[in-house]
């Protein structure tokens, strides 16, 4: 209980650092940026969220790590706030929905051709918690944990590279 309370307190204080790897359709307008847009429930859909005027303040930072010529990007994403579905909602709002996300897909007509080419490569949203840093609840030592991309996301990365190279020819 004590350790859990200490880590929960760090999360509330915003002293836990989390980074995610995301593969998105399209390309953000800038190599680095942030989405500062309030998130709340999507009217008529109790489990979904959206950028809404009366939503909770929400801030997501992103950096493009790879641009694929086939119409996708790999991003490093971090959260200044922790809203439900925040990355998914903010990426859709930015016009770059997560690959494989059935709920926050954006304009299907825009991304349908690439989505068809990626069918069967990944069967979930292409989002992975890759880095976590916090203070050990007992010793106070800074802990940094990293997690490599899972197999399905590495497969996606290879396929995006292959599709991009085939378009360059």
Model-predicted segments: where are they?
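RNA pseudouridine synthases
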Residues: 1-169
């Amino acid at each position: 209980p004590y350790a859990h309370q200490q880590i929960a307190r760090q999360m509330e204080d915003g002293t836990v650092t989390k980074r995610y790897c995301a593969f998105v359709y399209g390309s953000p307008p800038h190599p680095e940026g942030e989405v500062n847009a309030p998130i709340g429930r999507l009217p008529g859909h109790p489990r979904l969220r959206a950028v809404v005027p009366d939503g909770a303040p929400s801030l997501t930072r992103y950096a493009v790590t790879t641009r694929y010529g086939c119409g996708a990007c790999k991003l490093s994403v971090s959260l200044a706030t922790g809203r439900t579905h925040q990355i998914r909602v903010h990426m859709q709002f930015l016009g770059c929905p997560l690959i494989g996300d059935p709920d926050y897909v954006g304009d299907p007509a825009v991304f349908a051709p690439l989505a068809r080419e990626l069918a069967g490569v990944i069967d979930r949203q292409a989002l992975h918690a890759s880095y976590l840093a916090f203070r050990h609840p007992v010793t106070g030592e800074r802990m940094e944990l990293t997690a490599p991309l899972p197999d399905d996301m590495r497969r996606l990365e290879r396929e995006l590279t292959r599709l991009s190279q085939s378009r360059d020819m």
